[in-house]
Amino acid sequence: RGSQVQDAGLTHLKACLHEDPENKLCIRAHKQLRKIDKALQKARGFSDNSKWTAVVSALKGAKVGGPTIYDEIQQVILDAVSSGILPKTIKNPADQSELLHEIETLYCRAYVEQEMINKAMPWCDKLGAVDPRNEHVFVAKGEEQMNQGNYEEAVRLFSQASEVSQSLS
């Protein structure tokens, strides 16, 4: 799903470059999107193989202490709106970004699988705001409740995660 949206973005940028090969905004956005796509492909591959530490590492970006892939996508969106590549009529484009939601899912799941609930919760909360029925959000919240000793609430959340998971199967 995320790659379909990204492919649409690449198609739009390629059309922009075709119309004006010297358009610096389109050139820069195209290079950034290719770099982001490469990092996301790595993260998806690690996720498919349940290599959760590697998922987080791939999403952190190439430079230590530099912007994460998530930060880079947010910046690309802001730049695209301010430069007119994306129409200003789109309300809160970052909130509608399939790529950002995919990254939130990857971070949430990777941290939950590593039992790093404190690191998972900010990502799972962002994801839950967009997709409140996401199974990984329920699992994260269940783990958080377990850690706080709220066992009945944890069981309820784990049951909801199971229901969502079964409905997707």
Name each model feature, range by range.
Residues 3-4, 50, 115, 149:
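Residue-level detector of the short coil/turn that links helix A to helix B
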Residues 11-14, 60, 125, 159:
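Alpha-solenoid helical repeat scaffolds
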Residues 15-18, 64, 128-129, 162-163:
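Conserved structural position within tetratricopeptide repeats
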Residues 20-21, 67-68, 98, 132, ...:
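Short coil turns that delineate tetratricopeptide repeat
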Residues 25, 37, 102, 136, ...:
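Start-of-helix register in tetratricopeptide repeats
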